[in-house]
Amino acid sequence: MTRLHNPLTVIAGLTRDPLRNRDTSSRLGDGGSLSAMTVKSVSVSFLVIVCLLFSSCAKKQDPVESLLSKMTLEEKCGQLACPIGFNFYGKDGDSLWVADDFLGMMDTLPLGSCWAVLRADPWSKKTVETGLHPLESARLLNMMQRHAVENTRLGIPMLFCEETPHGHMAVGTTVFPTGIGQASTWDPALLEQMGVVMGREVRLQGAHIGYGPVLDIARDPRWSRVEETMGEDSFLSGTLGAAIVQGMQKNVCATLKHLAAYGIPQGGHNAATAEVGPNRLMTDYLPSFEKAIVAGGAKTVMTSYNTIDGVPCSASGWLLQEVLRNSWDFKGVVFSDLNAVNAIYATQHVAVDPAEAAALALKVGVDIDLGGYNYGGFLKEALQRGLVTEADIDRAVRHVLQLKYDLGLFDNPYVDEALAESEVGTAESAQLAKQVALESAVLLKNDGILPFGENIKKVAVIGPNADNMYNQLGDYTAPQDPDRVVTMIEGIRDKGRAEVTYAKGCAVRDENDADIEEAVRIAKAADAVVLVVGGSSARDFKTSYEETGAAIVDEHLSDMDCGEGYDRSTLKLLGKQEELMQRIYAIGKPVVTVYIQGRPLDMNFAAEQSNALLTLWYPGMEGGSALADILWGDYNPAGRLPISIPRSVGQVPVYYSQPQTGDYVEESAKPLFPFGYGLSYTQFEYSDLQIEPAKAMSFQRGNVRGRESMADTLCKVSFTIKNIGLCDGDEVVQLYVRDEVASVTPASKLLKGFQRIHINKGESQQVTFYLTERDLSVYSKEKGWHVEPGDFTIMVGGCSDVNNGDAMKSKIQRS
């Protein structure tokens, strides 16, 4: 097991003894009492002491087992319940206190963990004013932790869990681009740095577990949570996810979400069933989790709400035991998603009552019930009814206690509150958020209008997402101080390169068109237009929410068209946005269209009519400053799509690796913009592709128990890339493999390597990839992962559409 860096080596804290109430007499008796020994010579005494030390070491009980043996059934059940915590405190001005709800719960069922104490958003009803700022957060969690340590029988410290999909979801923290934007960077090193910041901000405030990254493979853009994912490909998602995990786990535990196949729900409905067989699961939807566990060292995993072929993921022994524990050798803690254990009974109807639901989840390996309802309220009943054994309960408790020991919580469970005030949400962290936003921007079209030249002296900025900070931040975002967020219009104005005018034009969803005429007026007077459209995952305090926190679509009309619970039946821009676009394009001025979006929306009209087209996804707190740098050429965009942009919703699902098919009657079967696509202000040329057998060597990219031979390198792929354009820039080099004939229908191609590299104009660089047996393997239920003899086509280029002129191909044969 890879041991976490002890967070207390990073954050100095108070020193307490959480085990002070334990009976230590048994430990003293393990090796005998030195004071009772009578020793008559130095040599003999030395021998006796050495013998005693060895005897003590041999007999010393594992601390987890020692503690477990002292626990009552109620105390064990408490370790497995993780209730929602944002109502566990009160705040009035500078006064802060632990709520009676928490104290009462600890009296009846001493909790092992708590979720979302620091969460602030409309669901929690916490605002910038009523929520907790970093110093208050650290104070509160120290207070709650102190109560657990000093006022419960065994003094077991708690785990505090927080949401961290693109920054800690709390007031005053750093807000990065959402997952789909992070994936557009194709930059593992950058995302590891981001993970360090996210984990550090969580730990500085007293929490220990960050929920994220989200590694669901998203292949249905109607689904409301595409924005949280790393896109459609498991190799890209797993590589980037492992990097984020490694960054986060320098300070906290990362939680991989959501195991498994949550991103392909029937009809695009959140939490709907996934109809997929074991072969496709293993090849398409599970490798991202495997890589983040095996290569990234992830310590915790969260199950998903959905069923797979009718079996709830939180009740799947095949998924949580055979695959997760046995095949991937996972040793950590498994959380359910919020109320997912109860869903086994309440909505999936696989259990007759909450106690049976608790039993089903516990027996297959769900260690902690997020929400706590079933394990906290019904696990004891399940034991009494013979649905579980105490050994089943002990197994889960053992996992939880071991994680607490690994985190160092029994040595020091507290944090230095002053550091939270000074080191959360820093200017340096904001600069990193800007860098992620810059690298995530994908240029989809450019007829030469970008970057803006000296002739662009007056710019009209128009659109519903041009000056709305929450629309650019995405779901799972806390309320913000406006001074900490740079909107699109603010970034452009702050650039100071042109006179700037602004009109909203319309809202994202509202049908009011009263402001369109003003938008047309300022567009006519400008040298160029920046038209900022798209969607929004901005929650507000009028929206209704389910018990899980998912938004409920109702008659209330906000800008929100995306985010958990907001599934779509079309991908069209809503409200009057298309009318606004038509009116602006008809003027004939140069138009740069910018999409702020959480899912791939319909871009056909914009791609046809715009002079330039960008997607920034949800770019986070520095999105406006990033856009301005790109518009004026201070940064050369090089983001690449991690998900295909469909031409219409009728193509869905459309993804790069699906077996080739014929066209539709109405349109091409190809996406509007393919996976891996993105333009630059410069051009690159590929040449000199060489493939040669590599010397046998261990290659640590996915050693899985029983399959260590898969780590052997089979061949080396090298080629040269040259920047033949007029400016320096990044290129994302992509390597794809196609198995020409296999016992299971092969994908049309699969990504097996990528590098984001910077090349100065006129310069060349040699790029090398190593392909392993796993890269060329096929999975079958009967044989597992194995390489079959035959031909493989190797393709390299700047996009998954490797039939373009920039791509190179070659074949290798495996005998």
Model-flagged regions — what are they?
Residues 802-815:
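Short beta-strand elements
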